[in-house]
Amino acid sequence: MKKILVIHNKYRETGGEDIAVSNEIKLLEQKFKVKVLYFDNNISNLFLQSFYFATNRNKKSINLLKQLIDDFNPDIVYVHNTWFKASLGIFELLKNKNIKVILKLHNFRYFCTKSYFSKNHVLVDNVCEACGYKGSKRILNKYFNNSIAKSLLISRYGVKYFQI
């Protein structure tokens, strides 16, 4: 029986993506041996979490995943949300372990990060077709939490996400 490791970073408030992941896990368990690695974005050390977020690598998450891979030895890793505690650093580990990866894109949040720092982020009607953001045609939009600094970090995350 094939083994699948599901990775999902839960949202602070349960929403559609979390429910979809839960439903898919139930479906997969009917045909495969499944383990689930959940992450959450509770912050215990603000400085350390900020560092992990800025570097797109969470050493604690990577080590947790490495241990689970060594114990479970999955054939496939099915990745849902990595924002932000799971981190993009998990993909380097998965590549080095030569494990097949399925990456599910639930929404287009990262697509719009490719452009939201430009005045082209919002079109003629001032609404981004990818995220629904309504704003002005400025050079820098405060897209994420009304903060240029946070917007810059998520933009960097989005660019790296599409390099995977």
Q: How would you describe each model-predicted region?
A:
Residues 1-164:
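Catalytic cores of nucleotide-sugar-dependent glycosyltransferases that transfer UDP/GDP/TDP-activated
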